[in-house]
Amino acid sequence: MPLSKVWAGSLVLLAAVSLPLQAASPVKVGSKIDTEGALLGNIILQVLESHGVPTVNKVQLGTTPVVRGAITSGELDIYPEYTGNGAFFFKDENDTAWKNAQQGYEKVKKLDAEQNKLIWLTPAPANNTWTIAVRQDVAEKNKLTSLAELSRYLKEGGNFKLAASAEFIERADALPAFEKAYGFKLGQDQLLSLAGGDTAVTIKAAAQQTSGVNAAMAYGTD
């Protein structure tokens, strides 16, 4: 049962200015390490290849910082990204533009074009955000349907352990933002940090109650 989400983020293909669509050089296609990233990256590969464009498959390259570094350094030509991550890329979390999909798109498009010569293509009608998902048995037993109720549950000493990626645990616009907004704080013993950012893995950990986990980092599209 997902409880809430942070940031508005349209899905966009982020491309380097030198994207060689009409050249002999293959297009280096990347994606993030998670299942959704793999699906989207493979769609890009198939579309390009169906139009006779040679490609290099770098799908599931790594976490957000890894993929971001790859495209800014020229190791990638194109990958799917979310506009809300502009707040993270440009250390600008306090600007309310990131909570509006269109405003966030316009802002990150301008910043990346000016500073990095990266082009944000036309956004897809898709939205995805981080959420916290709690096992159904825990949610029903403790009447948890929102993060406000989760905060109340935690303050009452409720049993809780979250499986999440290191990125989600550490990024200012992720778990710390949830904690700040809803007035709770998770201790290290309430966190299971898993490699990568694949929500299929975090959700599986909650489903199987790995190491006592009963909640998971998830995506709004999960």
Regions found by a protein language model. Give the residues of each.
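Ligand-binding pocket segment of bilobal, Venus flytrap-like solute-binding proteins
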Residues: 156-222
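Short, polar/charged alpha-helical segment
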Residues: 35-54, 176-182
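Bacterial N-terminal signal peptides that target proteins for export
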Residues: 1-10
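Bacterial N-terminal signal peptides
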Residues: 9-18
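A ligand-binding cleft/hinge motif common to bilobed small-molecule-binding domains
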Residues: 82-95, 104-110, 205-222
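Extracytoplasmic "Venus flytrap"
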Residues: 26-44, 60-63, 167-170
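A conserved helix-loop-strand patch within extracytoplasmic ligand-binding domains
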Residues: 102-161
